[in-house]
Amino acid sequence: MKVQIIAVGTELLLGDTLDTNSNYLSIKMRELGFDVYKRVVVGDNYDRLYKEIEEGLQQNDLIITTGGLGPTEDDITKKCCCDCLGKKMVLNEKSYAKLRKYFNEDEKAIQGNIKQCMFPEDAIVFENFNGTADCALIENNGKRILFLPGPPAEMKPIYENQVQQVLEQFATDCIISETLNISILGEWDMNERVKDIIESSNNPTVAPYFKKDKRILRITAKASDRQTALDMIAKKKQELRDRLGMYVFGENDETIEESVYKVLKEHDLSIMTSESITGGMIASKLVNVSGVSDYLKRSLVVYSNEAKIELLGVKAETIDTYGVVSENVAFEMVERMFEKFNVDCSISTTGFASGENAGLVYVGLGYKNTIKTLKLQLHGERNKIRNRVSNRALAELRLMILENVSRETF
């Protein structure tokens, strides 16, 4: 099935609002085996939208619009669709009853919003449980138009809970993609380890790419139904996991901090951070994960030399002899955490986020009194460096824990 997606709204053209809906819908169409041939943004202009829908119907089987379903004069999507298909607008009684209840029988408010209850005749209407603008699917001579709400918080639930199961009736193939997230390994190293798997995989296919400091392997399967595609992906994911081992830290949207939390929880380990260059960012990432309070026992921001000495107990002579940004200081920061606070795992960071030596960082890692340090030389602006250090430190600690637990098991 050929698909065109039309995002409606002048605010999108002006850059005031980002069109995330089209990207989301492209992924969903791919999963159904539908081919998205065109995506376009159109302002709140009747003539231009009419022309886009008219031409789209000539070239595609399904037009999906987002936005323009509100009660005001510039909400023109439904009228354009009706005019293109030669259909009348009729009142949907269920939507009307919902509107009356929403406005508590306030007749003035109801009449001001009644446009949202008008739909093309013979349309399948989907109730919007997160807003007042219901949406619909209409069909005419084998062509279909689906119009969805503009706000993503309304559009996504209505698509996933109602629309998708209707569109699945028209699907002949199902295309699904899932990803494996890989830490620490560089692009070349990762590719070398799985190069033969990538080259020999046709269905599912395996494609490597980078996204926000993550190495990602995307596995895409095409099958007659969703479950078959998922089974194919699961088998390929296991093959890749067997090859990459502990470097795989999660799937799809899972973050490194979520993966670290799982490891801490599984092995009942406490953790502490003492951060200089990262300024609490590592702890902040961990705190984003629900339940981590059971394992994150303390976090210190020791940005100044005085803080490292007074709060943590780093020796002044260590800083004077080796410099505050040094392997020795990172090591001693971890050592003092074990001595003073009795935790199972610890992370320390010290480095330069700007200036002549920007990107030079030392990370200290500790697991049950075993300590190691890591030297990093990173590039980029200040906050990018801090974020990369935080992610790398968490990834390295996770690997350190797993390697030690594995040795303890045997």
UniProtKB/Swiss-Prot annotation:
SUPFAM superfamilies the record matches: CinA-like, Molybdenum cofactor biosynthesis proteins
Signal peptide positions on this chain: none
InterPro entries membership: CinA, CinA-like_C, CinA_C, CinA_KH, Competence-induced_CinA, MoaB/Mog-like_dom_sf, MoaB/Mog_dom
Gene3D superfamilies for the chain: 3.30.70.2860, CinA-like (3.90.950.20), MoaB/Mog-like domain (3.40.980.10)
Superkingdom classification of source: Bacteria
A Pfam match: MoCF_biosynth
Protein family per UniProt: Belongs to the CinA family.
HAMAP family named among the record's database cross-references: CinA_B
Protein name: Putative competence-damage inducible protein
Source species: Finegoldia magna (strain ATCC 29328 / DSM 20472 / WAL 2508)
UniProt gene name: cinA
